[in-house]
Each structure stands twice: as structure tokens, then as C-alpha cells.
């Protein structure tokens, strides 16, 4: 088994050099000696990539698992401590591995076969009826509430921030994201009723109410998020403007068949819908949106067409999740009768967001390990590293799609966006009229 993995590594490592410490005590180097300069930073605050990395495999059983199912086994072995980085960070190790994967996966027959099988099985993995969706959400979002306060910003924005210059703090960039979205919602007057699908801990809803005078109904499938969102609303004295419900988007028509919302926003929730449910999602948005209303969808997408979710991510992080390509999202939008009035692609913004999360997680690692354990920390660190690299290496991005039912619902050009970002002039006192 070890010989088979050695043969694969010899062919696979064509960029940089990887040193492997085997269970039998031998050490083998693969690839060329690092004699070329590091690449320039793609964004502010991020250096070049490591060219010489290493790892140790601590038992022969792990080798068998990696050969049988590398996408799942490597993540499990790193989380268990059966594979450990040597002479480098986890980020450095994965960065070089991902670069080699990108260079070789498309031409290697095993890589092509794995991609085909993954795509064939994705509808099964993403079958998310209402009951399963609730369990999937609880798996990730109903963790100990302290965890998220230890690496997210103060507002607990668990989605891509907006870095206009790259020098912003996480708090500044997350605030900019919310106002960027608010501008696209065309909140041109107070009292507009907004539906927030997948409201998280309530940060977006509270911002729209506090700064724009909107009335907001937020829905979530997470009991922990619902509790926190309601508590925050009460503490800010915004109960008269903001309400939160434990509700699936598919149940909106049954709960309020005649209600229409002036605006609808969904941030970081669409990734949990599943490809077989895209039509149902956009049909629900279309039914709930006022004829002159505006909706904004903010979600992670793929840059190179349809794909499949890593089995490790599916098993341990986001069961039922999938980040679609635009080519998979636009057809169900068209079938729903909605009009895509604007599309913006945010490329490296999420890489920078996750870099901030990784640093905060590392700074609070001892506290998090006391809440959970070291294995959980290794698992979560791997999730953050892998996610950041997916955006840095151009396989993932974030799209914001503005939707409407009428061609005249939004301005003719984008010129309104900068001024609309600064329209947050309604104080909490002024909002009390609505």
C-alpha cells in the first residue's frame, strides 16, 4: 500500500517539494527543490506560498484509507492527528497540495473519474426536504454559541465581507457588506417590509431596521440563532420593527398565503438549499415578493461550472450543502418568472474574510479547545484553511444577484449604489413611527 501511494505522489507533486515521513521511519522527498521566487501577494496582507512542506503519516492504516478515498480520508486523518504537518503550517501544506491538485486533477484519469462520480451523486447528497434541512442546519449552526463569538466579528456575520481596499478591519468590512446589500435592495423610504431568508443571528435584519427604517421578518431553521436574534432585538429596543421565526422558506406560502414583501434578502443561506430544490426556492421568493419589489441573493458559487461538494465537508461541516455555478442558478430563476436585474461577482473578498476568521480562531484556540477538544479544533482549522484556499485559487467566488418581478423595480444603472450606501439616516427614535 505504501508503495502505491509513493508512486502517486511521485507523479502528483510537480510544483514545489513535499517531504513525507512514513510510518516505517523512512523519509521521502517529492518534487523539485524550491529554487524559484515566491509569487506576489494576491491581496493585501497575504504573502507568497510555501514551496517546501512536509507531513508525517503515523500509521499504515491511514495509507490504506487515503488510497481508497483521499478526499474524505485526508481530512479525517488530519483531524484525528494521524497525519500532521512537519516543518510548516497546515495552511502552507494545503496551499501546495491544492496547487498541485489544480495542475494535475484535470488530466489524471482518477481525478476525472472522481469528479464524474461526485457530480452523479450530488442530487442524493443534496436531497433536503424540510425535516432534513432542519437537521443539517442544526449540525453546524446549533453548536455552542460561544464558538462563533470567538472568531466572527461582533455582529456575528458568518458570510463574505466586503473589502473595498483590503485594509479594513473585519468589523468594517462586514458593516460595508451589509450596507452594500442594503443599497441594492433600494430601501428608498422607511417602513418597507423586508423578508430575511436565513437570517442567522439577526445582524442584517437589525441593520436594515436600525439604519434604514425597514420592518423586517427574519426566518431561520436554527434554534440557537433564533434565540440569539430575538434577544438582540429586545436589547436594542427594535421589537416593533423586527420579528424572527423558526420557519422553512417552503412554508412561507402556507403560513402567510396572501402576504407580499416589499424586499427580500438572503445572505449565505442558498448554499444549503441543494440543487434539486432551486426551483422551489425561487418560486417561493417570487410568490412572496411584491410585484414592484426587489430581492437580493448573496451566495457562494463556483467559477468553472458545475461540480460536487467535498465528501469531508458534507460529512463533518455542511451536510446537504452545495455551492452552485451561475449556470445552475440562472435557469431556475428564469423558470420562476423573476428577472435578474443585476449580478456582481465578489472574488477574493471571501478569502480575506476567512483569513481574518483563521487568525481569530488561532488566537482563541485554547478557549475553543476547552469548550470542545483538540480534535474539533483541528477539524475546524482544516475547514477554514480549505475554504480560504478555495477562494484564493479561483475555484469559488461569491455572487450577488438582484431580482425583481418588474423591469421598472430598480434604477436603470448602478449609479445609485454609492449614494444609497449612505442613506442610513433613520435613527432608532425616528423608526418608532413605523
Question: Model-predicted segments: where are they?
Answer:
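Feature captures hydrophobic
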Residues: 1-174, 180, 187
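Conserved class I S-adenosyl-L-methionine
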Residues: 190-198
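Conserved SAM-binding loop of SAM-dependent methyltransferases across substrates and taxa
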Residues: 201-212
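Conserved SAM-binding strand-loop segment of SAM-dependent methyltransferases
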Residues: 236-251
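A short acidic, Gly/Pro-enriched loop at the edge of an enzyme's catalytic core
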Residues: 250-264
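A short glycine-rich, Lys/Arg-flanked "PGG" loop and its adjoining helix->strand segment in the class I
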Residues: 279-291
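Conserved beta-strand signature within the Rossmann-like core of class I S-adenosyl-L-methionine
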Residues: 292-300
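Substrate-binding/catalytic lobe of Class I Rossmann-like enzymes that use SAM or dcSAM, i.e.
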Residues: 300-411, 418
